[in-house]
């Protein structure tokens, strides 16, 4: 998949293994039912004034005949490049052939550049050949670090929002949308921090992607998803790179212009033990 399965700082702390991978690109195809769910949940009805919006909240009932289905897709490594000084490697990822045959608009290629720095790692994700389609889709960059200790060693997953840092993603009132968080546009990000050892932390800063989703749920239209049970840091989190699921005067074809068929997202990983 191109994800990192070994990441350590020092001899004592390992942040990744085969069951806890970081920096995994995931393309998600959505079913017709999922495409309709946002409209049902948002419950917005302007009386049918505009023909593209039905009272049921579905963008287009004709999608039901497309065979659209819900699935998480992971790319595979096609080629690996390395700088002569060994400071960076570039992973060239290709999509599954089955995904392409379904007619979704997944990027034709994804490049992930990993660059080691003195106290951090820079990650550059670039995709090429993104096709504009009406089929419901979303793209994610997932991080599921290995959190040391059992569940009694409480970990906190926090985010940086505009004007305030380190907001606990589990401390959200009911019906407030705990499933999706906006980030501060200036070096905002997310941090996994040990409750018993606050100096032990894994942080990912996002320079371009402004939305993150905690836990395993990626149904971002279900703003009540964590009302009964908050997201668990052990389940990781992901940055939302793009989505066309919204029916609130939001662009449903992406890319809207051909120049955006190539997109770039930058991240910085910092780990403290």
Report the location of each language-model feature.
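C-terminal (or distal) subdomains of carbohydrate-active enzymes
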Residues: 1-273
């Amino acid at each position: 998949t191109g994800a990192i399965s070994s990441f350590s700082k020092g001899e004592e702390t390992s942040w990744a293994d085969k069951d806890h991978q970081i920096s995994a690109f995931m393309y998600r195809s959505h079913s017709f039912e999922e495409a309709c769910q946002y409209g049902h949940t948002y419950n917005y009805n302007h009386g049918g004034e505009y023909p593209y919006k039905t009272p049921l909240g579905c963008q287009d009932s004709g999608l039901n005949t497309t065979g659209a289905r819900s699935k998480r897709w992971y790319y595979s490594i096609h080629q690996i490049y390395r700088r002569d000084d060994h400071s960076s490697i570039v992973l060239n990822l290709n999509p599954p052939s089955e995904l392409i045959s379904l007619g979704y608009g997944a990027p034709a290629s994804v490049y992930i550049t990993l660059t080691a720095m003195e106290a951090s790692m820079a990650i550059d994700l670039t995709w090429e050949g993104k096709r504009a389609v009406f089929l419901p889709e979303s793209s994610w960059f997932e991080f599921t670090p290995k959190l040391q200790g059992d569940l009694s060693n409480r970990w906190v997953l926090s985010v940086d929002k505009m004007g305030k840092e380190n907001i606990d993603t589990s401390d959200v009132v009911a019906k407030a949308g705990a499933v999706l968080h906006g980030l501060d546009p200036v070096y905002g990000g997310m941090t996994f921090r040990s409750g018993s050892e606050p100096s032990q932390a894994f942080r990912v800063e996002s320079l371009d992607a402004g939305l993150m989703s905690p836990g395993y749920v990626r149904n971002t239209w279900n703003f009540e998803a964590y009302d009964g049970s908050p997201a668990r840091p052990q389940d990781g989190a992901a940055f939302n790179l793009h989505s066309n699921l919204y029916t609130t005067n939001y662009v449903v074809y992406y890319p809207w212009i051909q120049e955006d068929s190539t997109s770039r997202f930058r991240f910085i990983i910092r780990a403290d033990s």
